[in-house]
């Protein structure tokens, strides 16, 4: 049984999307139980429409919700201990839930998660990992916005955490890792990126296979299982990819409806276009994972549909079922154990 806590008030649509999304996820994963936090007058009428979900859920009333434009510092002051966002995170801290899923304000969610759960031992800064559709299937890209200007040691930490996530999500024994750079040559790039490459190579990590530098187009190609970068460039890459997907979709709709002949052609190629539309559908890969915390936190897009929110729950389910937190902790322990100088006669 996987226990998932939900911030019902998060996102642009709150319980009107989160609850139907939970119902869809429950159909796929009958072994889920939900712990829900939200405003009773908005949530109870919607929850009452889903009998199976109601049976598998415990509802806790919260009168405070965090708005999508609220500053993290303000959200912490106003919502700590009492908001639906805080209490859903706290359920993980208290061991009542295995994972929390929220579509709420990203900055506020990260601030509350860091304050409530704290970062893991030997992790300076957390990262947000995104699941990225590629020509080969899917890959993981991190960081996509949590840590701007990460240094070389933090990038190595991201590689360790991303590798653990790939093993949990894709069930790959030794995932390939690449550092995002302006070229694949060793001499190119910022000093922190070059130093991170050296650190990862010299660490000779058993849990991952370092493939060197990768460029922006390698992300979509699926050249490696995990692409590591700092939060500024990662967030730009993510937003650019999402914008490009929407642009291609708009181009296709325009081209296929412009003339009668185009409409007829579309009918013959409908199967292929439906497959392309599914590949470009952001709801299929919704759910950013906060890595480096003492608990699993999943961030859904704020404007997600019910189907997209269900996809975010799917990610949380997989991460909890496959022991993401334990995998990260074990990899970090192995790495730092190798770094410890020998003690006693061996040190002589």
Curated annotation (Swiss-Prot):
**Which pathway does the record list?**
Lipid metabolism; phospholipid metabolism
Its annotated compartments are: Cytoplasm
GO term, biological process aspect, one: phospholipid biosynthetic process
Q: Does the keyword Lipid biosynthesis apply?
A: yes
State which Enzyme Commission number(s) the record gives.
Answer: 2.3.1.274
GO CC, alphabetical: cytoplasm
Identify the main location: cytoplasm
What does it catalyze? Answer: a fatty acyl-[ACP] + phosphate = an acyl phosphate + holo-[ACP]
InterPro entries xref list: FA_synthesis, Phospholipid_synth_PlsX-like
Task: Indicate yes or no for the key word Cytoplasm.
Answer: yes
Q: Which UniProt keywords apply?
A: Cytoplasm, Lipid biosynthesis, Lipid metabolism, Phospholipid biosynthesis, Phospholipid metabolism, Transferase
What GO molecular function terms would the record report? phosphate:acyl-[acyl carrier protein] acyltransferase activity
Membrane-crossing ranges are: none
**Which major enzyme category is it?**
transferase
Any Pfam family hit: FA_synthesis
Function statement: Catalyzes the reversible formation of acyl-phosphate (acyl-PO(4)) from acyl-[acyl-carrier-protein] (acyl-ACP). This enzyme utilizes acyl-ACP as fatty acyl donor, but not acyl-CoA.
State how it assembles: Homodimer. Probably interacts with PlsY.
Q: Which family is this sequence assigned to? A: Belongs to the PlsX family.
Protein name (record): Phosphate acyltransferase
Which species is listed as the source?
A: Rhizobium rhizogenes (strain K84 / ATCC BAA-868) (Agrobacterium radiobacter)
Instruction: Tell me what gene encodes this.
Output: plsX
